[in-house]
Amino acid sequence: MMQEKDSMFEQMTARGHDRLCFHHDKETGLRAIVAIHSTALGNALGGTRRWYYESEDDAVYDVLRLSKGMTYKAAISGLPMGGAKSVIMMPHREFGRTEAEARAMGRFVDTFNGAYIAAEDVGVDTQFIDWMAHETNHVMGGETVSRGGDPSPWTALGVFHGMRACLLQAGLGEDFVGKTVALQGVGHVGQNLCKLLHEAGAKLIVADINKTNLDTAVDEFGATVAHVDDILKAECD
C-alpha cells in the first residue's frame, strides 16, 4: 500500500521525474500510466506492468518508484538510455488480457514518439508485446527476433551471478551445492532462476501468490513452499 501523502507533483519533484501521463481508452476500458523519470542519457526504457491496484494512489506510487529505478539500471549497465515505466490498472485480479487491450496500450506508448520504449514486466509476456507492436515500433521483448525475445532468462542469469558474487563476498565460496536459497516470487524470472540454482545444487524455498508457479517450482525443482508472509524470515544462506 502507498505510504506517501504528497501530491503527484510533489512526488514527481521529490523523485526527480520529467513526466507522469495518464491514459484511458474508451473502447477497451484500458487505464494506464506512464512515468518518465529521465532522458538525460537517451530515450527512456522500462517495462509495462499489468497489475491490480487497490487505488490510483498505489498505481502512481508504483510507477514512480519503478521508473526511477530504471534510470539507475540503465546507467549502471552503461546503456545510452533513460528510465521509465508504465502500469496497466486491471479492474480486478482475474481480469484476462486481450489483444485489444494490448493494442490500446501500444497506441498510448506510440504517442511518446520514442521518448518511452516499453518492454515486459509482471503480467506482460512476449505475446502481449507482439500485440502492442502492431500499433508502435517503440517496444522490446516480443517473440520475433527483431524485438529481442523474452528477457527473463537473461535477467535470471544476471541475478544468479550476482548471488554468486555475494557468496564470495561473504566468504562462502561460489558453490551453491548444499546452500539454501529463498525466492520471493517464481514467475518468469523466478522459474528461470530456480532452474539455474537447482542445476547448481541449491536447495530452494519459494513463495508466490500464484499456485501454478509454486506447483511448477515444487515439481520441477524440488522446492519447499513458504507462505508469502514468512519468506523473508525463512532460514537460508
Which role does the model predict for each range below?
Residues 1-147:
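N-terminal ligand-binding/catalytic initiation module
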